[in-house]
From Swiss-Prot:
UniProt organism field: Caenorhabditis elegans
Membrane topology: Multi-pass membrane protein
Segments in the Cytoplasmic topological domain: 85-97, 162-183, 273-301, 356-451
Protein name as catalogued: Sex peptide receptor-related protein 2
Residues bearing glycans: 15, 218
Family to which the UniProt record says this protein belongs: Belongs to the G-protein coupled receptor 1 family.
């Protein structure tokens, strides 16, 4: 089968009256377009423009998007690396790590197409269009990014639910929300998301056309991708096929998780306030160790509330938009705002905002988690971290005997964690009476701990 057709002079519009009559008769039959090359009326194929707003997309996808992705890749890769260290493995951190990987792929997968087509200027070279351009655009911009976004969406729900169980039912959380179960839930979310995203990969096949096309009353010299329905789409019917796909995506992966996130976020905030009152009561009762543990738990919960809230702020508008779009398409309701240029511009802006929030999560981790900061320094600034460790050991040698030995030890253990996942502690930390003796280093690992 010939997938690429070249014919006609791009600077000479067909002017034969016979061809014009054929073209007009074709359009009157509700055909897709009239092919001036083969002089055939095309009914089951559709032209697919690679862009809708050239100038806007050149700026957004060609200039802004690569910079945003660069920051997002660094931030999410750093988060995934830090949370992969053995001493950082907790149920909460496991979810955060997989969220970072999913969010990284949301930005990284479209990058080859945006660099090739927009940044490298091939948007102005469509006369060189080849078949692989069509498939690259489809899979990198349309098929796979929504799948990874679905995964990130449900992982955020898992994160909020896991944390709510941890603070509301701490005894049950150790068995129900352990690392093994969290990884199993992540696998189920990933597989389900890919299965629900598969229909988008099997809706159309492609060919290319280079020649004169008559459509909407005008002749156009087109170098364009042409979509052809697959056998699955033809047998099911386009209305049924796309209604199932978009309603599943809208309800199961946008509206429902958004509703659950609003609910769980509210419950988390309520739980944090209750835990704060408990901490104050423990302090009044002079149970300082329990109060310190409660403070750490509250800090983790506050960090997760911040992450979930940011995720909701940028994704709720998309949820509302997708819900309206599905209702209008299913019941053929006309809403002026959903016609014209608004939907495309809204989605472009919304996608950029989503990518721009990913580095913010990294900032939240650094600001609110001391263990994250320390592990990050050990991974990416090992020299500075070792110097800091040595200085604190020196400081410990000057501590008076009135200070508790456990205070010194816990202080050093918190800082001197090396990049291999080991905690590095001087013997002086373990035996405060011999702080002035020659230092020898001991290494030990922490056990996996639940929240």
């Amino acid at each position: 089968m010939n997938y690429e057709v070249y014919c006609g002079n791009a600077h000479a519009e067909p002017n034969s009256s016979a061809v014009q009559q054929l073209a007009e008769a074709c359009v009157e039959q509700d055909a897709s377009y009239f092919d001036g090359c083969s002089r055939t009326c095309v009914k089951d194929k559709y032209l697919l423009p690679l862009t809708q707003f050239d100038n806007l997309e050149i700026v957004v996808y060609g200039q802004i998007f690569p910079i945003l992705v660069l920051f997002a890749v660094f931030a999410n890769a750093a988060v995934a690396l830090v949370l992969s260290k053995k001493h950082m493995i907790t149920p909460t951190n496991v979810v955060l790590k997989y969220m970072a990987i999913a969010e990284l792929l949301v930005g990284l997968v479209p990058l080859p197409w945006t660099l090739f087509f927009f940044s490298m200027g091939n948007i102005k070279e469509t006369h060189r269009l080849e078949l692989w351009w069509c498939y690259l655009q489809k899979y990198s911009m349309d098929a796979f990014p929504p799948v990874f976004h679905m995964i990130a969406m449900w992982l955020t729900v898992l994160l909020a639910a896991q944390r709510y169980v941890s603070i509301s039912h701490p005894l049950h959380s150790r068995s129900a929300c352990n690392v093994k179960n969290v990884r199993l839930a992540t696998m189920i979310i990933t597989v389900t998301s890919f299965l629900c995203g598969l229909p988008k990969s099997f809706d159309y096949e492609y060919e290319t056309v280079h020649g004169w096309i008559y459509s909407h009353g005008n002749w156009t010299y087109a170098s364009s991708c042409v979509m052809m329905p697959t056998a699955i789409l033809t047998n099911m019917g386009q209305t049924v096929y796309f209604n199932i796909y978009f309603w599943t995506r809208a309800l199961g992966f946008i509206i429902l998780p958004s509703f659950l996130l609003v609910l769980l976020n509210g419950l988390l905030i309520k739980g944090i306030r209750r835990a704060q009152r408990r901490k104050l009561r423990l302090l009044r009762e002079k149970r300082s160790e329990e109060a310190a543990r409660q403070r750490d738990s509250n800090s983790t919960s506050l960090m997760l509330v911040a992450i979930v809230s940011i995720f909701l702020i940028v994704n709720l508008p998309q949820a509302i938009f997708m819900g309206l779009l599905c209702v209008c398409e299913t019941f053929t309701i006309k809403i002026p705002i959903l016609e014209g240029t608004f939907p495309a511009v809204f989605l472009i802006a919304s996608n950029m905002i989503v990518i721009a929030t990913y580095p913010i999560n990294f900032g939240i981790y650094c600001f609110m988690s001391s263990s994250f900061r320390q592990t990050f320094k050990l991974l990416f600034c090992p020299g500075a971290s070792q110097l800091q460790c040595e200085r604190r050991i020196e400081a410990a040698s000057a501590v008076h005997s009135s200070r508790r030995r456990s205070d010194i030890c816990s202080h050093l253990v918190n800082v001197c964690t090396n990049s291999e996942g080991f905690m590095q502690v001087s013997h002086h930390c373990l035996h405060v009476d011999y702080l002035v003796s020659d230092r020898q280093s001991t290494q030990f690992t922490t056990m996996d701990r639940s929240d």
